[in-house]
Amino acid sequence: HPLIAGSIGPTSMLPSLGNISFDDMAAAYTEQMSALLDAGVDIFQIETCQDLLQIKCALYAAESLFKARGSRCPVVVSVTLEPSGNMLVGSDISAITAALEPYDFIDVLSINCATGPLEMVRHVAHLAEYWPRAVGVMPNAGLPENVDGKPFYRMTPEEFASFHKRFVTEYGVNVIGGCCGTRPEHLAEVVRQVSSLKPAPRQVKKQAMAASLFSGVSLRQNPAPALIGERTNANGARQFRDLLEAEDFA
């Protein structure tokens, strides 16, 4: 049967900027998520996220609710990256993956809204390379234009679907869809072009990361540091002193 995802939005507040406290936002999310579960949704879709702290708050509410009820549903987290390549508060895709990877109950990490599929390619490529679980992408139908004072999305269903075909066959994307500007015709064409395809296998690179609000940093140094041990001491190691005196540096 079709799966019903309950949409859980970013609210109008950014906790990283002090617009709302963590506890108040968590309480609001808990109330919404409880209502969604009572209504019978199959999936939590925490989407259009623009602040890592807001995501963590929603995940805290979801995990607390799952523990209280003794059961859980799949969780999708979908972030919004502006044309600059960053979330609204400045986080880039490396910060997102580094900060969210420890939350092992995130089933899908996705990108949605703000831009069209073309602008999302480099971010999808990063997720395909570094995110260890399922990847999703739900772009707009291109970037909006102002036509007679109204937003107009020019991307055709065929163009839109061709990007999704690429996402699946080149980057191994598992979940696809559409956001602003997409119409039934866009999604029908996506189904026509993509429904028979299997996601390409991914070779995910595992690496230890640390992250600020803005970017992620690998903890692996290249080149690696040279470790100098106690035996490389001319006073305490006669063999080492003899090698130095013989200028044997091999």
Where do the language-model regions lie?
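Domain-level signal for soluble alpha/beta catalytic cores
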Residues: 1-250
